[in-house]
Each structure stands twice: as structure tokens, then as C-alpha cells.
Curated annotation (Swiss-Prot):
Belongs to the class-II aminoacyl-tRNA synthetase family. Its cofactor is Zn(2+). GO terms for biological process: alanyl-tRNA aminoacylation; negative regulation of DNA-templated transcription. This is Alanine--tRNA ligase. SMART domains: tRNA_SAD. It is an enzyme of class 6 (ligase). Disulfide bonds: none annotated. The gene is alaS. The lineage of its organism: Bacteria, Pseudomonadati, Pseudomonadota, Gammaproteobacteria, Alteromonadales. Catalyzes the attachment of alanine to tRNA(Ala) in a two-step reaction: alanine is first activated by ATP to form Ala-AMP and then transferred to the acceptor end of tRNA(Ala). Also edits incorrectly charged Ser-tRNA(Ala) and Gly-tRNA(Ala) via its editing domain. Zn(2+) binds at H562, H566, C664, H668.
Length: 874
């Protein structure tokens, strides 16, 4: 009955729907209005504001199958993916949720009933864990459900602090939290591992399949646990794990989804060994990559786009290992859509974009992969130790586009590690290499050439009737499109705004009797407007009359951000200077991004002044006036033009009081007061002479203010002050720290002077030259430079080599007086010693520093230095 993951997903959603739960679609992998997350990584993410009491829904019970990615930041499974049975970059989290509705008894009963009655799992294979003091949960499991006491395992604070437990869930240091109960499945005694709470619990025999979180407390800043007035429930069950159980396999990579993706990958590349771990890596990575692109993330060198690029390139590298000689990764998308079933809805709509973006990235990487792998191979062959230096790893990243974890992946196969600290240091030195974010796939459909002309009628209304004048399927003109097909529909007139001037295209619906076309984007093709989307019902022919309806909510939120962009532009010119000109923008329902020419970072005081000026204009509640006029007349009136836009002789001018006047064909609010509130969220440089401001408006701005206030309150709690005193309290703390650091530095200098006086007497005479080679115990690495300077002053003409080991790292410094550098160079000396401790270094002839990781080799390395020096002094 549940031989496929798709059927299992449907059964889960259907079961909870019969129990009064609202089926909620998976949210995007890009978290909405949550700066704490890189990617959506749990089913509860989209309900976070509901649990926090900041949002309300029309339902109090929900169920979902949430797409999740864990491949960056705190939740980073990338290194283990493909090498273990259950690590993935992408997974689906099945979950049911109660927002102040049912609580422990119902949540426990729902889970047990689904597992034992719907899925018919044998109860003798199941055991549960509870928080150590949660007697209520114990009674429910034992008395109500009938689980034997020996199969209910109490887990205490096993992470070193109160409430720090595998069975106590916390959203953060403060806020909703509570005990949780986990259900485990026993895969059988033929697999090593022990029950939860035993020393063998990390084995693969007992696997957690369902976590039920009981949010019943609100943790205060002082640690106090106050009962929530309306306790809630958040549960999660990884679909891959339960699918493995239902399909009678132990590894997630043996379930239907992965079997088909692995088989297809092997077929495309021409591989017969289906157990090869590289096939697992590729099968996993196509899921995260395809769905990330479908949710709007594109490969780039920063943020989410960089994580995506890392995953794509790791998959391509494993394809190369398998013998792939041509692009292959994008060819897995159709198979992925097939195996994901209903969960692939968004992927179906964006399939063309996803495939083209994957192919473009693969082709770009393929051009450098072979050369980069050759360089890495040479570096590893020449390596004498077991650590690849950070400079080489950075060169691979900087020159060949190798993410450092891909380099680490190759090294791992030879039992070699990468000096990640050295890599980060090299990265910091060359940070100026940053480039603007990539835009793979953004313009693929704009390659269409359409001779038709569409009249825009969306300034005053969001609906209207129109005739279909052209249809396009896969870039080709057709006379008809039918249900299930992705198409571009061209109308003779439309209320849909096509992407232009930074404003995103409208979304909505085209319909008629028996026809439903979902518009997911609107683009310009010459004089025509193309409505991109999918035929959900019926068929559309050229000549069909359709009702066009723009998504009102998305349009209105976009208009808030577009109108405030004009105010922002004018405010920047007033505060910073008239040299400020727009270099680009993005205006969508969620936020606005404004790029402008400016020679330096905008000062905090200037940003505050700009924000206050914009909000003052919002409060003025100016009416927005539009007028069409000749472009020369508009310029005479002082209207500003948008970067990169082409204008006709007749232009549309948008005016807001006497504050802003711009050429603009976009849609706007009726009055500036409609914007409500404007908040700047970030300001940064994106290229030489170009700055970027990101901001939010309306409800999104209110949410941002609330979030900032919450953080301020938390900071006040940590400083044991009120919000108004945070700055003064923090300044006092910093002043105190600065004074302590000054005193510590002075003390170190005194200690170094004293130590150098003692050590100077240990210098040996080698061929008439004073040579001091010494290992120092318990010396801070930061003190080496001062100590070396003191010794050079005392010894006058001398060669000095000092080494110390701390926290698993070796630090070396060499000093040579100027009269001896012709024979012995400090850089060569320290490099020779560093090589023996798994490190690298260098410097000037008279002073050089180095580091290493092989602490155990330090004594022998220092001992070899005297011989090396003697040979050069002979």
C-alpha cells in the first residue's frame, strides 16, 4: 500500500486532514521574513510567527510536508552526504501542528494511531523517549496508549546545562519551549546499536522517526519557565526515514526516490556499480539544487547562491569521478519531478529555468574542473604531511571556483585534511574579489521574439477581459496549449504588469468557462506582454477570450515598495548629494533593493536621516500624480530616469508632492500614506563606487521593528539593564575591557623582558655565531614577536628560533640580525621547520613567522634547526 514515498506522503496528509487539520503547502526553501535562517530547515519554520503569537491563521490545526535544506551554517550535513545512511542536503519533514488547540494526549494518540494502524508498524519494534521530569507524558504513553514502562525511556539534561536535552526543545535562549517525546524504530538485532540513552545509542539499530514537541513554557531572560496560556504542538517526521521502514530497507538511499535517481544517474553517465557512493551524492544533491533554484536561488558567490554553487559543483565533481564526459546533472530533473509526485508542483512550473541554470553552472565549472583537479593532484602528491595548506585551497577557490569543502572532499579520500584557518585568512586578505550575484535563468524566456502588441490597462484596475493573440510552448509559437503544459500566453490587452524598471511581473489567473491558467510571472517581449505559467484546467487557443485577474495582495505590496523607492532616491540625493544616481533596483512584494552610485559607505547618521526623511514624506500623505509628456519636457521639470531603461519620446512622469519626480512606467500607491512605514535593513557596497540599500515597508517594516526591539530587549537582559541604558552599559563594559587589555599587554611586555634575560644565556656558539633555538612552554603565541625583539636586542649578533604549542597548533618565529642574513635567512629557516610540523610560513630575511598542526613533531623539528644553521654558517 505504501510502496512509494509519494503514497506515504499522501497517506500522512490525508490521515491528519480527517482529524480536522488544514493541509498547508510546503513553504519556500528561502525563509520568509526570518533573518535567522539561511534555508528552511524544519516544518515549523513557516508557523514560527504563529507559535510566537505574532501571527494568526484561520485554522488551529495544520499538517504539511515541508521541503527542507541543511547545507550551510549551523545545520550543515554536506560533508557526510553520500557516506552515511541518513545524511541529506534536502529532505521532507512531515509534521502536524496545533496552535493552542489539542495538546499532549491528542498529539501522542495521533502519532501512535498513524504508525500502528495506518502504517501497521509492529508495536514491539517501537519505543519512545520523554523528558526526564515529564510524568504527564509517561502516564499518557503508559496508561492511555499501552506502551510498556520499559519501552518509555526518560532522557535528562544530557547537553551540560539545565533544559539542554535531546528531549527538551527550545526556539532560542528565550521564548516558547517545552519537553518533547521521540518515537524510535528498532531495525533489528542484526544491526549494531543500542536504545536511546545507552552508550551505543549512536548506532543504526534504533532510529528516531517522529519527534513530538510540547510547547508549554515561555522561557524568560532570567531562565524562568512560565506556562504558556495556550500550549501548542509541533511535530516532525522525516519522510525518508519512515519510507525506508515501510519499504523494508535500512538506508534512506535504498528507498524508491533514491533508487530511481541513482539508476538514472548511472544510465546517463554509464556506470554499472550502483553501490558507488558518488551516485548517492549526486542523487541527493539534485534534490536540493533543483528545488533551491525553483524557489528563486541562483548560483552565485555569496549567501544562499554560494551554498547552491557548492552543492552543484560537488555533484559535478562526483560525476567526473564516475567518468562523466559531458553535462549530466540537469538531465536528472525530469526523473526528480516524476519520483517526487505532488511535492514537485513548484518544480514542474519552473522546470525549464531549473534545467538551464543547472546546465549553465555545470558548463562553467567543467571548463575549470580538469585543470583545477590537476593542480590539486600535484599539490597533494608533493605534500609531505597530512594537511593541505590554506593558500593552495584558496587558490583553487579563487582561480578555479573550487569551494573549500570540495577540496576537502578530494583530500578526504587520501586521508588528508585542509588548513581551514589558513584558507579563511587568505580569503580575508582578498575579500575585494567579491562579485555581484549571478542571475542564471532570469532571461531565458526573453529570447522569444513576438510581433504582437499588448495594451496595458492595469494602472486603474486589476481585472479585465482580453483575447489571446499568441501562444508559446518551449519557445515555439503554437495554436493551442492544454492542461498540464507550461506556456506563455500573449493577450491583446492586460491588467498584468510586466517586469520592468526593477518591479517584478504580476502573478494571477487567466480564466474562462472550463479554463484556468495560473500566471506565475509576466514579462515583456518587445511590445508584447507574455503571461508565463501553467494550464491547470482545459485548453487555450489563439482567439480565446479570457478574464484576466491580477493577484491583488502581491500587486499592492509591490506598489508599497515601488513608491517608497522613489522617495528613497530623492532622500539620498538630498542627504548625500546630487551625484547619487540609481544603478539598479528590485521591487517585489516582500522588500526593495536599491543600488546607487556613491564613492563611500553611507554613514549611520546619514542612513538615519534618509530613513526619517522618507517617513516624513509618508506622513505627509502626498497624492501620487501621473502625467504623460514629451521626454524633453519631463527632463526640464527635473524628472529622474531609471538606470538601464530605454524611453520613448512620450513618457510617464510620477510625482509625489514637491519631493520626488521620476520617469516611471510602474504601478504605485494612491497616496504616500498608504506605505505606512519604511525601514532600512542593510547598506553595503556591491562594486567599486556602487552601494546597495535594502528595505521593507508596511507590515514587513512593522515586523522588522518588532524583531529589532526583541533583540534590544534580549541584549538589555544580558547586560542586566533596561533597553534605554543598553548603550551606556555596553560602552562602560567596552571601556573596562580596553583597560584590562592594556594592562595585560603591559604585563606581557614585562614578562617577555624578564624571560629574554633568562633565555639569552642559553644561546649556543656555532662557528662563532650566537644561536638560540628554544621550545617555550605555556607562552601565548601573541607574545613571541615581543620576546624575539627583546632577545635580538640582548644578543646583538644572533640567530633566534622560538617555537610553542598551544590548543593543538604550533607557532614559530625566527629572527636573524642584519649582519648574518647573507648566510641565514629567517624566512628559509622558519619554512624548513614549519614543513616538519605540517605547516607553512615565511617572511623577511631578518624576521619570519609560521604555524603548523603537528604538535608531536615540534621537538624534532627544532632539533633539526641547529644542524641546518651550522651547515649554512660553515
Amino acid at each position: 500500500m505504501f510502496e512509494t514515498t509519494a503514497k506515504l506522503r499522501s497517506a500522512f496528509l490525508a490521515y491528519f486532514e480527517t482529524q480536522g487539520h488544514q493541509v498547508v503547502d510546503s513553504s519556500s526553501l528561502v525563509p520568509h521574513n526570518d533573518p535567522t535562517l539561511l534555508f528552511t530547515n524544519a516544518g515549523m519554520n513557516q508557523f514560527k510567527d504563529v507559535f510566537l503569537g505574532m501571527d494568526k491563521r484561520s485554522y488551529s490545526r495544520a499538517v504539511s510536508s515541508q521541503r527542507c535544506v541543511r547545507a550551510g551554517g549551523k545545520h550543515n550535513d554536506l560533508d557526510n552526504v553520500g557516506y552515511t545512511a541518513r545524511h541529506h542536503t534536502f529532505f521532507e519533514m512531515l509534521g502536524n501542528f496545533s496552535f493552542g488547540d489539542y495538546f499532549k494526549e491528542e498529539a501522542i494518540r495521533f502519532a501512535w494511531t498513524f504508525l500502528t494502524e495506518t502504517l501497521k508498524l509492529p508495536t514491539e519494534r517501537l519505543c519512545v523517549t520523554i523528558y526526564e521530569t515529564d510524568d504527564e507524558a509517561f502516564e499518557l504513553w503508559n496508561k492511555k496508549i499501552g506502551v510498556a514502562a520499559e519501552n518509555i525511556i526518560r532522557i535528562g539534561d544530557n547537553k551540560g546545562a539545565p533544559y539542554a536535552s535531546d528531549n527538551f526543545w527550545q526556539m532560542g535562549d528565550t521564548g516558547p519551549c517545552g519537553p518533547c517525546s521521540e518515537i524510535f524504530y528498532d531495525h533489528g538485532d542484526h544491526i549494531w546499536g543500542g536504545r536511546p540513552g545507552t552508550p551505543e545509542e549512536d548506532g543504526d539499530r534504533f532510529i528516531e522517526i517522529w519527534n513530538i514537541v510540547f510547547m508549554q513554557y515561555n522561557r524568560q531572560a532570567d531562565g524562568a519557565m512560565l506556562p504558556l496560556p495556550k500550549p501548542s504542538v509541533d511535530t516532525g517526521m522525516g519522510i525518508e526515514r519512515i519510507a525506508a521502514i515501510m519499504q523494508g530497507v535500512h538506508s534512506n538511499y535504498e528507498i524508491d526516490i533514491f533508487k530511481q535517481l541513482i539508476a538514472k544517474t548511472a544510465e546517463i553517465i554509464g556506470v554499472s556499480d550502483l553501490e558507488n557512493k558518488s551516485l548517492r551524492v549526486i542523487a541527493d544533491h539534485i534534490r536540493s539544487c533543483a528545488f533551491l533554484i525553483a524557489d528563486g536561488v541562483m548560483p552565485s558567490n555569496e549567501g544562499r547562491g554560494y551554498v547552491l554553487r557548492r552543492i552543484i559543483r560537488r555533484a559535478v565533481r562526483h560525476g567526473n569521478k564516475l567518468g562523466a564526459t559531458d553535462t549530466f546533472f540537469y538531465k536528472l530533473v525530469p526523473t526528480l519531478i516524476s519520483v517526487m509526485g505532488d511535492a514537485a508542483k513548484g518544480l514542474v512550473e519552473t522546470q525549464v529555468i531549473v534545467e538551464k541554470a543547472l546546465k549553465a553552472e555545470e558548463e562553467q565549472f567543467a571548463r575549470t574542473l580538469e585543470r583545477g583537479l590537476g593542480l590539486l593532484d600535484n599539490a597533494l602528491n608533493e605534500l609531505s604531511g597530512k594537511v593541505l595548506d590554506g593558500d593552495t585551497a584558496f587558490k583553487l577557490y579563487d582561480t578555479y571556483g573550487f569551494p573549500v569543502d570540495l577540496t576537502a572532499d578530494v583530500c578526504r579520500e587520501r586521508d588528508i585534511t585542509v588548513d581551514e584557518a589558513g584558507f579563511e585568512a587568505a580569503m580575508a586578505e582578498q575579500r575585494s574579489r567579491a562579485q555581484a550575484a549571478g542571475n542564471f535563468g532570469a532571461d531565458y524566456n526573453k529570447q522569444l521574439i513576438i510581433d504582437e502588441e499588448t495594451q496595458f490597462c492595469g494602472y486603474k484596475g486589476l481585472s479585465g477581459e482580453a483575447n489571446v493573440v499568441a501562444l508559446y510552448l518551449d519557445g515555439q509559437a503554437v495554436n493551442e496549449v492544454t492542461q498540464g503544459q507550461d506556456a506563455v500566453v500573449v493577450l491583446n490587452n492586460t491588467p498584468f504588469y510586466a517586469e520592468s524598471g526593477g518591479q517584478v511581473g504580476d502573478k494571477g489567473v487567466l480564466s474562462a468557462q472550463g479554463i484556468n491558467f495560473s500566471v506565475t510571472d509576466t514579462q515583456k517581449f518587445g511590445q508584447a506582454t507574455g503571461h508565463q505559467g501553467k494550464v491547470l484546467e482545459g485548453s487555450i487557443k489563439v482567439g480565446t477570450k479570457l478574464a484576466a485577474e491580477v493577484n491583488k495582495d502581491l500587486r499592492q505590496r509591490t506598489e508599497l515598495n515601488h513608491s517608497v523607492t522613489h522617495l528613497l532616491h530623492a532622500a539620498l540625493r538630498q542627504v548625500i548629494g546630487t551625484h547619487v544616481t540609481q544603478k539598479g533596483s528590485l521591487v517585489n512584494p516582500e522588500r526593495l533593493r536599491f543600488d546607487f552610485a556613491h564613492f563611500e559607505g553611507v554613514k549611520a547618521a546619514e542612513l538615519k536621516q534618509v530613513e526619517e526623511l522618507v517617513n516624513a514624506q509618508i506622513r505627509c500623505n502626498h497624492e501620487l500624480n501621473t502625467a504623460e509628456m514629451a521626454i524633453d519636457e519631463a527632463k526640464e521639470k527635473g524628472a529622474m530616469a531609471l538606470f538601464g531603461e530605454k524611453y520613448d519620446e512620450k513618457v510617464r512622469v510620477v510625482t509625489m508632492g514637491d519631493f520626488s519626480i521620476e520617469l516611471c512606467g510602474g504601478t504605485h500607491v494612491g497616496r504616500t500614506g498608504d506605505i505606512g512605514l519604511f525601514k532600512i535593513t542593510s547598506e553595503a557596497g556591491i562594486a567599486a563606487g556602487v552601494r546597495r540599500i535594502e528595505a521593507v515597508t508596511g507590515a514587513a517594516a512593522m515586523a522588522y521593528v518588532a524583531e529589532q526591539q526583541a533583540m534590544l530587549d534580549e541584549a538589555a537582559g544580558l547586560l542586566k539593564s533596561d533597553s534605554a541604558s543598553v548603550v551606556a552599559k555596553l560602552k562602560a563594559q567596552l571601556d573596562k575591557t580596553k583597560q584590562l587589555e592594556k594592562e595585560l599587554s603591559q604585563l606581557k611586555d614585562k614578562l617577555a623582558a624578564a624571560a629574554s634575560a633568562d633565555m639569552a644565556g642559553d644561546a649556543q656558539d656555532i662557528n662563532g655565531v650566537k644561536v638560540l633555538v628554544k621550545k617555550l612552554e605555556g607562552v601565548d603565541p601573541g607574545s613571541l614577536r615581543g620576546l624575539q625583539d627583546e632577545l635580538k636586542q640582548k644578543l646583538k649578533s644572533a640567530i633566534i628560533l622560538l617555537g610553542t604549542a598551544k590548543d593543538g597548533k604550533v607557532n614559530l618565529i625566527a629572527g636573524v640580525s642584519n649582519d648574518l642574513t647573507a648566510k641565514v635567512k629567517a624566512g628559509e629557516l622558519v619554512a624548513m621547520v614549519a614543513q616538519q610540523v605540517g605547516g607553512k610560513g615565511g617572511g623577511r630575511p631578518d624576521m619570519a613567522q609560521a604555524g603548523g598542526t603537528q604538535v608531536e613533531n615540534l621537538d624534532a623539528a627544532l632539533a633539526s634547526a641547529s644542524t641546518w644553521i651550522a651547515e649554512r654558517l660553515a
